[in-house]
Design a protein with these regions (language model features):
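Alpha-helical recognition segments enriched in aromatics with Gly/Pro capping
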Residues: 1-191
């Protein structure tokens, strides 16, 4: 799904019209605002900036309207830094009449910090600096990737030591587990 689909399909305009028709927006200082405070939020949020540009909030509302119309259960996985944004979006979807309690799950997860040696691998999705998980899997394997990610809860910060994950010795827990599995398998095989 591309954000441009929201514009090209007309869904974004339909959603903005619905928001207006339901009295959920107002104009101020040349911008269009959503009435978040009407639903207990700390402040109202901009949908369309004074220069005419849409905000992420506006397109995210439209995207979630699309998802509510096409899917039974919506699962969003966001970085923990989006905590306030989750509340904002949930409020908007409730205001539009969607069953967020039973159909929308927003999971907030901590970021994984990839480390090589003593240096962190700098990442920023906004600037386009990131290390895709597919590349990590190619480099260290799917077993090691899964293992290291599963050692922490989603709410916990993960320092992912790439060099350790590559090591082929007992310092690397996944290597040790794989080695133990191979030994046990051989013992069982020899019993037959």
């Amino acid at each position: 799904f591309n954000e441009s689909d929201l514009y090209e399909s007309g869904l974004l305009e339909e959603v903005l019209t619905e928001i207006d028709d339901k009295g959920l927006s107002y104009k101020k200082d040349g911008a269009l605002w959503f009435k978040n405070t009407k639903f207990g939020e700390d402040k109202d949020r901009v949908l369309i900036k004074s220069n005419g540009d849409m905000t992420y909030f506006a397109t995210d509302i439209a995207y979630h309207v699309y998802k509510f119309k096409h899917y039974d259960l919506l699962i969003d996985i966001w970085g923990a830094d989006h905590h306030d944004y989750a509340s904002r979006l949930t409020t908007a979807m409730k205001a539009l009449g969607y069953d967020v309690k039973n159909r929308l799950q927003i999971h907030l997860i901590q970021f994984a910090n990839l480390v090589r040696g003593s240096k962190s691998i700098s990442m920023s999705t906004r600037s386009g600096d990131f290390y895709p998980i597919q590349d990590l899997v190619k480099e260290i394997g799917s077993d090691a990737t899964k293992y290291f990610y599963l050692t922490k809860k989603k709410e916990q910060h993960l320092e992912f030591d790439v060099d350790l994950a590559i090591e082929k010795n007992k310092n690397n827990p996944i290597y040790y587990i794989q080695y133990a599995h191979a030994r046990i398998t051989k013992i069982i095989h020899n019993l037959d």
